[in-house]
């Protein structure tokens, strides 16, 4: 069985085709703003203009008649972007006369991570621009055991990068600068129970930069503080749930320093650490295709008349009836 998935919750526009064995095709055409952060209206216009050619590139590699299921990211995400993707998926499903499956974006990150790494019952640390959560499955639902109280870590990194004059996406640029950092400067460490906050830390880091602290040292201090917070709450969830696997997913999962801190923590606890390949860790169409395929095989289908977008779609809202 073969599924096509369309991802476009924010700046990434991606179409993937998968079967049970692996990724057959994956094409990307992200929206990169000329300056500043992501503008939802401009991002949605980009998606609308580029989707037809992106589909054509996919169908140059895959026979459209071989598609069994059409999946799309139903939420959470930016409303204008989600609507473009949902409209395209509906039209494609109707044209091909194939079933449609709306997929929770966060769930797709976790499931493609499990698929690619072999993790069975992990505590998942989901780190992206729009959100940051500590997730684990309990019964027939994934539950959020801790999350950001304000902005996602990816958004925090981008805000700091923009303030220092760096272009989007800022995360990779902060990572490179941090490698050259030589001095740690204090920043607010905000963990409240299992939740955490980044907005105050961003403001404090921006003030450090404005006061003349080296850009490299600001980046280093920010990463060390933020990633220590994320590692702490992940370790706490691991202990509370008595699990022995950690899965790192989302766009910020590509950060080598975050991987290193989590790996060290897991080694200290005798737990296994997993992270999917970079091309499947961030937002991508293959994760939507795979999760849509998984859902369809277990009885999930989205009627066209109920395929409305859900900008605030929570992972807990999805019933999980597969292993």
Curated annotation (Swiss-Prot):
Keyword Acyltransferase: yes
Cofactor binding description: Binds 1 Fe(2+) ion per subunit.
Gene Ontology MF term list: iron ion binding; N(6)-L-threonylcarbamoyladenine synthase activity
Cofactor(s) named in the record: Fe(2+)
Class of this enzyme: transferase
GO biological process: tRNA threonylcarbamoyladenosine modification
Enzyme Commission number, as recorded: 2.3.1.234
Residues that, per the record, bind substrate: 126-130, 158, 171, 175, 255
GO cellular component, one term: EKC/KEOPS complex
CDD domains, alphabetized: ASKHA_NBD_Kae1_arch_bac
Keywords: Acyltransferase, Cytoplasm, Iron, Metal-binding, Transferase, tRNA processing
Keyword Iron appears in the UniProt entry: yes
Protein name, UniProt field: tRNA N6-adenosine threonylcarbamoyltransferase
Organism: Archaeoglobus fulgidus (strain ATCC 49558 / DSM 4304 / JCM 9628 / NBRC 100126 / VC-16)
